[in-house]
């Protein structure tokens, strides 16, 4: 019989046992009294947004005061870790099958595997660049057609009167495109909504996000982002490219499509989480490279934002994929622009060249840049707080697909109405000189030979607007135009992010920052006697764009390199780095980064690089799950089926033990086996009795496990007869005989470092006699969080 004691149910921990209010209010719409308490307490808007650090001092009793050493528990209805997320197996299972396969492989076999990895990375880069090219061409053509139709209508309506028809036309066109994109996301593949960067960060961190790298997700993501950008929303197409690259990498590296049920019999060796993770890292980097024309920035993004494992060869392969991606995009866009071989469009967004002679900066301007970084951090924190509360509202009340589509169409209509109103009432007319490069200039009420400057920002794709703010001549925009645009676009972008559409936040952030950055440059020139010092406001637009984007997403290293590569001027590396560091420091003081906020709102058990501070006094004994369900090395089939069928626990890893004597002494650890392995063994009827009676039966190989990967069948789909339940199963050949273990007194930071660095899914806690006393999983470690009141413990519940 299995060594089965009381099985641990995550939802039965502590005070979570059957509470009538169990479950997250973010999902079921229940009240949050603690929020109203904070509001009435007169806190600042930034402190209100930090539900994870709610003030608990007024609730401490004398009994609780005696146990101040324990981590405080955040109230259940405010912060949760969801049980619906499982971990990925980033640790190789070195069982007998694995070792035999490695032993049989020759030197040439290993060389062929290494070559295959490079080939896959090249394919990932090529396909990512090709997808980016398709997105860019479709958006350019459809947006160009839309704006030309609207422009012709505005010209006719201006002459005849009645511009309301133009407003209605603009709003209707926006709504139609956005409706199509929102229906695809809300009704067919919700995981394709947003930029996808938080989901890919979680995947690379080791969290299994359902449906995140499926073919259907890619199709909806690509078509959806086309509709979102053409629909005029305050979004960008660059963020979703990272998700698209990751999906392409996950599909290509497996040599088959489970969605299409097509197996190409290629790259079968890579059908495991460890290999797939490395290729997804390459896909994410290729997506960044295609988006910004920044291959080095793509590598650093993959390292900074997600990769849980890194080595030198992986760095080279990821860089190779990034270079292939940007070259592919560059090459095909040169053909599209009828300039074959003119490789001047390395990314979806082209910032243009920032020539050192024209846009040079002086040493005494660096303090001004740092001050702009602080302003960007503050505005980024404000953006994140507002989006945080808006997301909570959406989770509570806008959770039906119909409502999600209606909201997206409402935002599209409001965006069109606001844009039209701002252009209509703007009196900022600029001369239409020979150097003017805008494709859709609007004259409206301006004199002949002039155009409406406000229309340059609103009546355009976001990428063109950013480039205009960077490189337009001084005097192109007046301060009022830039101020009004910054204010309106800030709130439009905040409202838009989180809709059920495929969209990114990179370009809106750059656009907002470029607008107020250019405004700062104009104001500096106006208040100084020597205007030549601040002659070009374009450099302040660049600094403002970096500050705003850094204040929202809180990336430093990778974003610095991305901006430097996109501008083509390495001399701006130092000020951009200082600006991004300042924006992150200031922003983190008020609120977390936007991606981290959305990860927490989804209750994902995300593990950061380091364990929470002040946690050294906690040990493995206090954080582990116990008692543990164990299996004997030779176990009864019926017992295994019963354990796997137990929906109250749904464990995925089982220590394998062996009895050293016939007395009641606890059994000793001899290995670890996963649920997925047991499923395959049951499916192939790998029973001791059948093996004896069928001497010519084919021996189970690793290929059988790889063929079942990644969608292992549920236990309910496997038929086991009553006679088969009485058979025995020998796990010796299939279990991992050398699982990682720690003593009970190991400190939490050491457990965390081992778990995080090695990409583990299960960590066995054993006593001095090597007997199993507990099991540490991702959720055990993610429960502990450092808040402003010290170490806090999150709740675990089925959401």
Predicted regions and their residues:
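Short, glycine/charged-rich "phosphate-handling" switch motifs in NTP-dependent
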Residues: 775
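Alpha-helical transmembrane segments and immediately membrane-proximal extracytoplasmic
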Residues: 2-662, 668-721, 727-736, 763-764, ...
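C-terminal intrinsically disordered, low-complexity extensions immediately downstream
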Residues: 754, 791, 797-799
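Conserved Rossmann-like nucleotide-cofactor binding loop
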Residues: 771
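Structured, soluble regulatory/oligomerization domains located on the cytosolic or IMS-facing side
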Residues: 741, 746-760
């Amino acid at each position: 019989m299995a060594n089965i004691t009381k099985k641990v149910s995550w939802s039965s921990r502590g005070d979570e046992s059957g509470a009538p209010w169990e479950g997250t209010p973010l999902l079921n719409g229940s009240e949050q009294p603690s929020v109203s308490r904070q509001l009435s307490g007169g806190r600042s808007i930034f402190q209100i947004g930090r539900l994870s650090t709610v003030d608990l001092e007024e609730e401490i009793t004398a009994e609780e005061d005696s146990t101040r050493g324990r981590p405080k528990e955040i109230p259940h209805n405010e912060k949760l870790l969801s049980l619906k997320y499982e971990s990925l197996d980033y640790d190789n299972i070195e069982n007998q099958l694995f070792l035999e396969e490695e032993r049989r492989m020759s030197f040439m076999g290993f060389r062929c595997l290494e070559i295959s990895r490079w080939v896959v990375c090249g394919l990932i880069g090529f396909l990512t660049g090709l997808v980016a090219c398709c997105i860019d061409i479709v958006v350019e053509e459809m947006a160009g057609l839309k704006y030309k139709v609207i422009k012709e209508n505005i010209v006719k309506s201006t002459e005849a009167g009645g511009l309301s028809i133009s407003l209605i036309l603009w709003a209707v066109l926006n709504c139609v495109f956005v409706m199509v994109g929102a229906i695809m996301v809300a009704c067919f593949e919700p995981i394709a909504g947003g930029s996808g960067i938080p989901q890919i960060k979680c995947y690379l961190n080791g969290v299994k996000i359902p449906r995140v790298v499926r073919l259907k997700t890619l199709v909806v993501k690509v078509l959806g982002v086309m509709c979102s950008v053409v629909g005029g929303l305050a979004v960008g197409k660059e963020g979703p490219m990272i998700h698209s690259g990751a999906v392409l990498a996950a599909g290509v590296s497996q040599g088959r499509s489970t969605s299409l049920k097509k197996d190409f019999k290629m790259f079968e060796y890579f059908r495991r989480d460890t290999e797939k993770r490395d290729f997804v890292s390459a896909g994410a980097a290729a997506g960044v490279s295609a988006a910004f024309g920044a291959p080095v920035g793509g590598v650093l993004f993959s390292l900074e934002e997600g990769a849980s494992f890194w080595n030198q060869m992986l760095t080279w392969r990821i860089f190779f994929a990034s270079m292939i991606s940007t070259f592919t995009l560059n090459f095909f866009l040169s053909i599209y622009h009828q300039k074959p071989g003119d490789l001047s469009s390395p990314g979806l967004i082209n910032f243009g060249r920032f020539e050192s002679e024209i846009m040079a900066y002086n040493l005494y301007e660096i303090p001004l840049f740092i001050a702009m970084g602080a302003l960007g951090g503050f505005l980024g924190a404000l953006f994140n707080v507002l989006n945080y509360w808006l997301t909570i509202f959406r989770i509570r009340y806008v959770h039906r697909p119909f409502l999600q589509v209606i909201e997206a169409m409402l935002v599209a209509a409001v965006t069109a109405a606001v844009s039209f109103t701002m252009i209509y009432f703007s009196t900022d007319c600029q001369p239409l000189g020979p150097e003017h490069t805008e494709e859709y200039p609007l004259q409206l009420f301006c004199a002949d030979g002039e155009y409406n400057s406000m229309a340059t920002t609103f009546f355009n794709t976001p990428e063109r607007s950013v480039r205009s703010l960077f490189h337009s001549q001084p005097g192109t925009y007046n301060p009022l135009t830039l101020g009004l645009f910054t204010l309106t676009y800030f709130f439009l972008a905040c409202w838009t992010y989180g809709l059920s559409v495929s969209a990114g936040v990179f370009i809106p952030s750059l656009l907002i920052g470029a607008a107020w950055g250019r405004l700062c440059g104009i104001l500096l020139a106006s208040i100084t006697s020597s205007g030549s010092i601040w002659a070009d406001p374009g450099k302040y637009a660049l600094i403002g764009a970096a500050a705003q984007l850094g204040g929202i997403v809180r990336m430093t290293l990778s974003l610095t390199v991305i901006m430097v590569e996109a501008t083509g001027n390495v001399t701006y590396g130092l000020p951009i780095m200082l600006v991004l560091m300042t924006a992150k420091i200031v922003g983190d003081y008020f609120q977390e980064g936007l991606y981290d906020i959305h990860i927490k709102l989804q209750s994902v058990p995300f593990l950061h690089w380091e364990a929470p501070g002040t946690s050294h006094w906690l040990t493995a004994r206090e954080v582990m799950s116990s008692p543990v369900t164990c299996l004997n090395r030779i176990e009864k089939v019926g017992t295994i089926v019963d354990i796997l069928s137990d929906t109250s626990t749904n464990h995925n890893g089982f220590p394998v033990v062996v009895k050293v004597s016939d007395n009641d002494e606890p059994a000793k650890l001899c290995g670890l086996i996963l649920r997925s392995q047991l499923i395959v063994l049951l499916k192939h009827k790998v029973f001791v009795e059948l093996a004896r009676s069928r001497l010519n039966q084919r021996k189970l190989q690793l290929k059988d496990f790889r063929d079942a990967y990644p969608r292992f069948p549920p236990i309910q789909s496997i038929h086991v007869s009553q006679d088969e339940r009485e058979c025995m199963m020998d796990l010796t050949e299939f279990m991992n005989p050398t699982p990682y273990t720690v003593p009970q007194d190991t400190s939490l930071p050491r457990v965390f470092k081992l778990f995080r660095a090695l990409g583990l899914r299960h960590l066995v806690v054993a006593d001095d006699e090597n007997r199993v006393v507990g099991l540490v999983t991702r959720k055990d470690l993610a429960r502990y969080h450092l808040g402003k009141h010290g170490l806090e413990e999150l709740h675990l519940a089925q959401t």
